[in-house]
Amino acid sequence: VRSHLILNMIIDGKKEAQSLRDAIKKEIDSLKSKNNKVPGLTVILIGNFAPSQIYVKNKEKNAKEVGINSDVIRYAKDVSEQEVLKKIKELNNNEAVSGILVQLPLPPQINKEKIINAIDPTKDVDGFHPINVGNLSSGYNATVPCTPLGCLLLIKKIEPNLSGKHAVIIGRSNLNGKPMAQLLLKENCTVTITHSKTKDLKTECLKADILVVAVGVPN
């Protein structure tokens, strides 16, 4: 975020994340005391892809810290698509499971679109289901992918009022760029999305009050 008042500011993401976990823990403790219930998160992990193992381990750790019941269902990388779909249907009907997350990427024999569409939209933790994507695009309440939502929370720590700001987003992925644009539009920003085919990217970036980079590669 560019401002005549703010020249350089390092945001401590770990500190902000801890504050958010503390707030969530208080909410869950309150829910438990009133209703004797806590949210339940089930993660489906397929194969032994190292980064996915790390992501899931961190999800388990954070869920435990805030008081969420966490379960990980692990499958070998050659599991059939039908078996995973059957498990998702079972989780959709399980009242103890309030959130379902299928860790990506998936092996080639499994259709990602089918898997995402099979998840109950109200239990879609990633916000990838077409209903959640459509609701976000329409400005309605929706489950939002965690990376753009976290980015917005950090931006608003610096500048709570984003109305009228010019935001430039580098990257148009369904995971980051597109939902980030929708979130900033909801904050009444003027949003420009740039990508690998954008001409004169430097000029576009220089116009920005807010610059969000989500391309996954350096330089």
Language model region names:
Residues L41, A63-K77, V191-I193:
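Short beta-strand elements in bilobed, periplasmic/extracellular small-molecule ligand-binding domains
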Residues L7-N35:
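Positively charged, low-complexity intrinsically disordered leader regions
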Residues G99-V102, V213:
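Redox-cofactor binding/interface segments in oxidoreductases and associated redox assembly factors
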Residues E83-E95:
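Short, well-structured alpha-helical segments in soluble
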Residues V1-I6:
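Intrinsic disorder/low-complexity segments
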Residues V102-L162, M180, P218-N219:
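Anion-binding alpha/beta catalytic cores of soluble intermediary-metabolism enzymes, centered on
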Residues P39-L41, A167:
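Conserved hydrophobic helix-helix packing surfaces used for dimerization/oligomerization
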Residues I46-E60, A142-N219:
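Glycine-rich phosphate/diphosphate-binding loop of Rossmann-like nucleotide-binding domains
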